[in-house]
Amino acid sequence: MRFQLCYLLGLLSVTSLSHAASNLICYYDSTSYLRQGLAKMHTHELDLALQFCTHLVYGYAGLKAGTLELFSLNVDLDMFYYKEITALRQKFPQLKILLSVGGDRDVDEAHPNKYVELLEANRTFQQNFIDSSMILVKRNGFDGLDLAFQLPRNKPRKVHGSLGTYWKSFKKLFTGDFVVDPLAEQHKSQFTDLVGNLKNAFRSANLMLSLTVLPNVNSTWYFDVPKLHPQFEYINLAAFDFLTPVRNPEEADFTAPIFFQDEQNRLPHLNVEFQVNYWLQNNCPGQKLNLGIASYGRAWKLSKGSGLSGAPIVQETCGAAPGGIQIQSADGLLSWPEICSKLSQNASAQYRGEMAPLRKVTDLTQKYGNYALRPADDNGDFGVWLSFDDPDFAGIKAAYAKGKGLGGVAIFDLSYDDFRGLCTGQKFPIVRSIKYFMG
């Protein structure tokens, strides 16, 4: 595999006029400290990874409904952790440490559209956000703020039979495409204005500003790329979770392929290449873009109707399989150490049953990703299909980012990597692989 990765790196280097990718943006979800058992992560356990990271993004702050001020989502934790995290700069003086807002952790069922409300707000309320951001960032010693705004998402792909596909095409003649945000153009302009005002305030205080494009947030709706990119030090594309068992419960497919696989009516934008090219083709300098890589996988529950091969797209799935016990996930999410503990290296195995391992299928094309499966038993139980990036495939993506001339890679996040070395004895194998192939 190392030879194949080196070959890919060499191939990409001659097909793109690239500079060495230098950024390794490391996200850290502070709630990992609240987990139990082996998934609980203390700040001192970050040290080994931070020798490789250029930036640490601490998540997450939230947006207070009503006043639209930036605030801590967990005051009891953050009042202690903010200072402890920014104090890491004493050990790693070159490390830039930012506070991130949103990131799909700002759950507010009473106000699900508050980030859009911020865009639509008058100057007084937007100034509340700017002023409170300045105070929270400066008071706690952060170098800047990362905007991971929870904006409306693309509509999930629907599963249709042949008759359903025909009816959908016929109906589209009269109804057009489904519109998620009818005011998207207005919101795009409002986002640009808000960022400009925020940048002006931050510039006077010598603070950084970065953007994180969350999974399935449509860049064409909200981001005026030529006007926006000068306002940000860098832009992180969370190019994963294109499909998940929550968004796509009836079919399983690669969650973060690099390239488009033009088969089985796949949508052409659900891949890394499309997302990266959109920003590059809209005049964003490659050095400002960082490719986001997930250190976790997503698992679907298989039925008897899902078959035995596991080759995606897998049909007749039943939503999310049980997620990681250690990370207490309810939506089919498993961290890398939880994934590796479930894998069998026997490629021809057809294990069944609740405690049986998953059969890993490696992507020899190095284009789409790896997956693993355990077919459902005779009663239709305990079937699992899992899409994930292991350390080797994370290295392939790092090589891709370098070959495209991007600024670097962003890992989401450190607490889902194997920070205890449970898989092979090596700690942070995904971070290490990314760093190695970034050069």
From Swiss-Prot:
> After translation, how is this protein modified?
Glycosylated.
Task: List the GO cellular component terms.
Answer: extracellular region
Query: A GO molecular function for this record?
Result: chitinase activity
Extent of the signal sequence: 1-20
Q: What is its main location?
A: secreted
Biological processes, Gene Ontology terms: carbohydrate metabolic process; chitin catabolic process; chitin-based cuticle development; ecdysis, chitin-based cuticle; epithelium regeneration; imaginal disc development; regulation of stem cell division; wound healing
A Pfam family name for this chain? Glyco_hydro_18
Could you tell me the superkingdom of the organism this chain comes from? Eukaryota
Which keywords annotate this record? Answer: Developmental protein, Disulfide bond, Glycoprotein, Secreted, Signal
Q: List all disulphide bridges recorded for this chain.
A: 26-53, 340-423
Span of domain GH18: 22-439
Annotated localization: Secreted
Glycosylated residue positions: 122, 218, 346
Database matches in InterPro entries: Chitinase_II/V-like_cat (IPR011583), Chitinase_insertion_sf (IPR029070), Glyco_hydro18_cat (IPR001223), Glycoside_hydrolase_SF (IPR017853), Glycosyl_Hydrlase_18 (IPR050314), IDGF (IPR015520)
Annotated function: Cooperates with insulin-like peptides to stimulate the proliferation, polarization and motility of imaginal disk cells. May act by stabilizing the binding of insulin-like peptides to its receptor through a simultaneous interaction with both molecules to form a multiprotein signaling complex.
Annotated family: Belongs to the glycosyl hydrolase 18 family. IDGF subfamily.
In the UniProt entry for this protein, what further remark is given in the free-text comments?
Lacks the typical Glu active site in position 150 that is replaced by a Gln residue, preventing the hydrolase activity. Its precise function remains unclear.
Q: What name is this protein filed under?
A: Chitinase-like protein Idgf1
Q: Which organism is it from?
A: Drosophila yakuba
UniProt gene name: Idgf1
